[in-house]
Amino acid sequence: MSFVLPPRVPNGRTIADFCCKEGGASFGYYLAGFDVVGFDREPQPRYPFPFVQTDLREIDPEWLRQNFDGAAGSPPCWAHSDLAHRTGREYEDFIPETRELFEASGLPYVMENVEGAPLRTPLTLCGTMFEGLRVSRHRLFESNVLLTAPRPCPKRHPLHFTHDKRKAHYGQLDEWSAFVTVTGGGNSSKAAAEDAMGIPAGWMTKDGLNQAIPPAYTEWIGRQLAEHIVAERTVTGVPA
């Protein structure tokens, strides 16, 4: 990792981020003011926050409740990805176990996944909703907190830069100003994808970038989550 975390205004809350990978979602919660602790069953040497290598199925929900103000997670999306649908290959699905842990903890939670994943009444976020992003990258967010989007997703999205000569707009767009595709055929360079997603340059590997979401998504959601925590504690009389 070769970047310095930018300054932000701490909100005094701590959030646990499960299946954190290299930290795209965690970075957004950090920008929203949370202190973040990441959990993943694989080593994550590029993760920029305190990190615990463990399987979420080993976590005690009571321990989680006592040590954190909120919980977040991005269980592996392979089981619900376009690739799985095209190939018919089966992948392990951690969504039920993630939900079970979060609900048992009683904490406000957010769970993120790809379109098509079986999330409950999810909010959909898209890069077009955020100033400065140049990706579509639709993602679903399930929560026990009422979440809203910054604006509606347009019916038609901007054309994306492509290396695919079969596309009618091939050669007409610049990857540093147009929308880009981070994964899949005809995708952009890693550097342009980082810029388009609001990811600091030089932080993530290409695989990490492929699995990440724009931090702007979880910064937006994190601010709503923090407001909910304060409001809930005000109602219950617990010091905010």
Language-model segment annotations:
Residues 18, 40, 53-55, 59-70, ...:
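Class I S-adenosyl-L-methionine
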